[in-house]
Amino acid sequence: MKKLFATAGMLMFFGVVFAGGLLTNGNQSAQYIRMLSRNASTTYDAVYFNPAGLMKMDNGFYVAIHSQTLFQTKTITSGYPYLNDSKYEGEVTVPVFPTGFAIYKLDKVAFSLGFGPNSGGGSAEYGEGLPSFEKTISGLVPGLAGLAKLNQNVTNYKTAISFKGESIFWGIQGGASYKINDMFAVYGGARYVPATNTYTGYIKNIEVKVNGAFKNAATFLGNEIAPALKGMANQSTAAASSVQPLISGGAGGLTLAQANGAGLITAAQRAQLEGGLLGLGVTSAQISAMPITTVQGTYNAGAATLNGQAAQMTATGAQLADKSVDVKQTGSGITPIIGVNITPVEGLNIGMKYEFKTTLKLTNATTIDGTGMFPDGAETSSDLPALFSVGADYKVNPDMNFSISYNNYNDKGVDWGKNIYGEPRTISDNCWELSVGAQRTIVKGLAVSVGYLHTDMGVTHEFNSDFSYYSNSNTFGAGFEIKPMANLTIDLGMLLTNYASAAKSFKDTNPAVGNYVEMYDKHNLGFAIGLGYHFGAK
């Protein structure tokens, strides 16, 4: 049963990233939501996407506050045959996903600050658990089929499972940009990443249907079946002891029929001993040929087996008792960042940025650990991979511009640990993203934009599990930029992400199950609004 909650130990793989790499959120502004290509930005969100590009802004002090509302639906369909329901759905909801930027630009230098959820930022809730939580419980039905010999027919199960996780890795970034000349500008800075993951969940009220009625599984196995098996073991031990006088008297080589014929045991005693042997699985033919010494050995072996089964039922019953988890993990890391902005010709701007790997360890603060899986104070590595980004923006005319962006996450440089099935989470290729966007001014103060983003995750079959899975995706964004006055900018945007279905094949150790497949699906929907103000604009 420990396996049922082992998934929660992989906190860094909770999977509430909405746009970006395996852990990194790329959706850092409303401008991004409506255009999806921002790596050559020269306005407010350049603080995150292209900090060297801040040198293209006019002098003054700038402040922008953006927020997004994000929804993600995860659907898992399992082919495991013993589950009561093959479909599991989880909802990830982020009502407020805030980001903010502040810039002070003066001639050849600019200082900037930014904040936002660098990873995570939401909560996911599985009201009916996950297949990996329930498989062990559903296996009780075939696993207890042998109890039919005790006239205890187990035909179904039910349980209450719930799991909720929240993850937020904040990013608080600061740095300085410097204009070398009209063509080149550079940036140096860092991002402080305080991280928190919170996990709560329970598995309770596990019941099995026995002879048509549901019973508490822990009580049934521990208080009914285990004592019954123990009683049968005691009877076997007594039967073995009852034939010892015959063996001591030299009749150990006789069969029960011969001992009865010789008057050493009565017909009733013979019938009782033979009935006990039949109960242990010995055939009538074997009993007829079995000497009394073997009868005694069979009863002793049967007693040992029954005692072992009783102990197993007691242990299994204890594992099926209600279990809860309430764990919080915290930690922090630093991300060094450098950037370059290049303007080779008028109208063309190129931005480049490199974020170094962030070393980050999370420490358990455990309130409830009914599984023994989350020792208080234990540490877990949750490094963030390095990121290289480059983009270009071309202004066709004062009313129209196009942009293209590329991101590459060095996922191979991070140890991703193992998934809940014990498989190493390996990377076949580093995650990369390619996006294009366009913006056109319709009338003075109003522009419309659209964007497209393709993400290739580069994960292997072993990487995914029902707890955390990734697949290639296509994202579409659109929105508006509104300027009611020269120093105020309002951004409105929405995006929709479609993920390719991911399949994971399993080979169960139970021959009756054999091979089966789980399908993983999800989709995102997001809305954003942003307000930017330039103090001192003319």
Positions of the model-derived regions?
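Repeated loop/turn-to-beta-strand initiation elements of outer-membrane beta-barrel proteins
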Residues: 61, 108-111, 183-186, 347-350, ...
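Extracellular loop and loop/strand-boundary signature of outer-membrane beta-barrel proteins
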Residues: 83-88, 158-162, 321-327, 373-379, ...
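Outer-membrane beta-barrel "beta-signal"
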Residues: 521-538
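Membrane-embedded beta-strand positions of outer-membrane beta-barrel proteins
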Residues: 63-67, 113, 176, 188, ...
